Amino acid sequence: MERPAPLAVLPFSDPAHALSLLRGLSQLRAERKFLDVTLEAAGGRDFPAHRAVLAAASPYFRAMFAGQLRESRAERVRLHGVPPDMLQLLLDFSYTGRVAVSGDNAEPLLRAADLLQFPAVKEACGAFLQQQLDLANCLDMQDFAEAFSCSGLASAAQRFILRHVGELGAEQLERLPLARLLRYLRDDGLCVPKEEAAYQLALRWVRADPPRRAAHWPQLLEAVRLPFVRRFYLLAHVEAEPLVARCPPCLRLLREARDFQAARYDRHDRGPCPRMRPRPSTGLAEILVLVGGCDQDCDELVTVDCYNPQTGQWRYLAEFPDHLGGGYSIVALGNDIYVTGGSDGSRLYDCVWRYNSSVNEWAEVAPMLKAREYHSSSVLDGLLYVVAADSTERYDHTTDSWEALQPMTYPMDNCSTTACRGRLYAIGSLAGKETMVMQCYDPDTDLWSLVDCGQLPPWSFAPKTATLNGLMYFVRDDSAEVDVYNPTRNEWDKIPSMNQVHVGGSLAVLGGKLYVSGGYDNTFELSDVVEAYDPETRAWSVVGRLPEPTFWHGSVSIFRQFMPQTFSGGRGFELDSGSDDMDPGRPRPPRDPDELH
């Protein structure tokens, strides 16, 4: 049998070599052999060492010994500001790779490791101090961490403070620097049971030293999310506060909050605003609500489901109490939902149903002036507009009354509408023709006019329409393409196509994103896909699944107490009485895995 040819090269590595080398160097140090430098710590204590070991262990010593500094040739090097016991620990680490961090040495060792550039030791000290965070030291610990650029410890301290702000003492909170308090108030993670607590935190800080701090009140109030302060508190406490009453910027913030609560503030038509985002700790969430539609057997659905994108959970809301039929329209007005019109195939409906989100109930309100189907509804300046080919009317929820308006100048079949920049826009084909046009309604003049917006995209029929950040988005029903119109610049644009077609799907705006759900996909299969478009990244992503494949459904977004929470206010603040408890709805059971595809 022929022997194999010998190897020309035999790769070899000893995994124990590094540890063996460290042990050897440590032994040489103990035997005081080949030592070529002595470090002198505070107090005059000497530490003999090897330059090569120090330079390899620390960029600080590498720069000292490898450069042209006097220390590169000196036999003795004096280190200022380093306690002897901390230098001992760092030298031991250089030779062993081990250090014992304790409550007695963590902070001074971190300071020394930061000065002498031992990042691993610094990180270990920071990790140890994270475990020691408590109510008594968290504020000082954040100061310490930021002073020494310990990002991990600083972040952990801030998370601890935000989570336990209600348990911190008044004196601790009142001595916060302005920048730190603003950072806490602006953070989504600030754990308060209600937004009133954030307001009280800011107000207490100002009242602790009014002569010096009153000038900062507008800046602080802007960091409070006033739209989510309960209405009775807004009127009884915020509006009555002298610091607010005599400050024009504060009055503007108060007016914004009142407009929001009165459904006169269209958050989708404006740019992103942190004040319009509830804090997770309050239990409020902006949710996607699905109403009606048909399942894959074409059976009508009367269920009302809501989806919380923060948790990915679905819940049942109160079922629609009547036969929905077809051709109805759905819109959100504030935090309530309105279903208008429709038909049962033989007669048209003039009825209007309102879903009251605060009590999780449906109730009929004043009927429309005219029965209709396949119309469109939108909200502009707190009023509900219903637009059909031959008529337009407007509903005022404060008086529960309808008002007839001028009809469109050019009647359009099966149009879609959206409110943008203080105007109402309608898109559709001229009655009896295939020509697509856009018309605009001015509420100040009660007049419709054609919009000279150039060549419209080649739509086969009216696309689904929504407004986001002052732009109008048009989601085609027969393709995955999406068009965008900027009414201010009178310009058209396209965004990346959706991941799939959503024929008969639904469009809504939620959390600064477009949400398209359900409908038939590219393979003509009924889909349960929910995908979202983020304008910041200009990308679509699948964010969830419907409870079941659905088409011809309506979807809107509202703010609601999605998950009930219990919360201890602690001693940092006390809330005034006042209840706004609401039915959170029933959890929707998970679908049978066999139904998923």
From Swiss-Prot:
The keyword Cell division applies. Gene3D superfamilies: 1.25.40.420, Kelch-type beta propeller, Potassium Channel Kv1.1, Chain A. InterPro entries: BACK, BTB-kelch_protein, BTB/POZ_dom, BTB/POZ_KLHL21, Kelch-typ_b-propeller, Kelch_1, KLHL21_BACK, SKP1/BTB/POZ_sf. Component of the BCR(KLHL21) E3 ubiquitin ligase complex, at least composed of CUL3, KLHL21 and RBX1. It is found in: Cytoplasm, Cytoskeleton, Spindle. It comes from the Eukaryota. This is Kelch-like protein 21.
